[in-house]
Amino acid sequence: MSKSPKYWNSAKLYLKKKDKIMKKLINKYTDNNLKTRKDVFYSLCKSIIGQQISVAAANSVFLKFNLACKNKINPKVVNSIPSSKLKKCGLSRQKIRGIKELAKKYVNKKFNPKLIDKMNDEEAIQYLSELRQIGRWSAEMILLFTYNRPNIWPVQDIGLLRAISNNYKKEYFPPKNFVNKLNKKFSPYCSVATWYLWRSIDNEPIQY
């Protein structure tokens, strides 16, 4: 895991000036910050595994997946593992297909994560979404956690919406216009605001 992004401290100062709730959260959660794993393949696998299941279930499946890979989660290793072995890890047929196709695209050089460095956020989301089992939410998680993009606001994320409801005393789901208002307010540091909102509802900081 790497250090926090270069923009982190500037973002905290900016958000504290912009919003009272954000100031309260930033002052409360001083023990940690966004940690980055500079391994796109690893993070994509983790994102696919974590789709539509609880955090605890995702962690359990990922642990078994890591053991199946003998602690070497890379395209060549994953490409060589039989689907039957991945099924025993607790992966659904769709997720196995997504992970296997991802590994194959890496091995055959049909997917190049370095291209994302030259793309804006929307271009990168489109490029990542071309991968099987990777939709907008998964692409946003990759941009936030792996590429450290500063202005990701994942409005499809249940945790973010719940945190907005809790902290701003709104119904669940919070009104779309209010979520959009916060987006504009926190820009260009929505990723940092998202991280602190997540932190307010989860004892352990989220990592990918």
Predicted feature residues:
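A positional/architectural concept
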Residues: 10, 17-71
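A general alpha-helix detector
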Residues: 43-48, 64, 81-85, 123-127, ...
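C-terminal accessory module of base-excision DNA glycosylases/AP lyases that mediates lesion recognition
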Residues: 1-32, 122-123, 136-145, 149-208
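Alpha-helical ds-nucleic-acid-binding substructure associated with the helix-hairpin-helix region
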Residues: 21, 25, 54, 58-130, ...
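Short alpha-helical scaffolding segments that buttress acidic/His motifs in well-ordered protein cores
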Residues: 44-49, 99, 103, 142-143, ...
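Structural motif
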Residues: 34-42, 90-94, 183-190
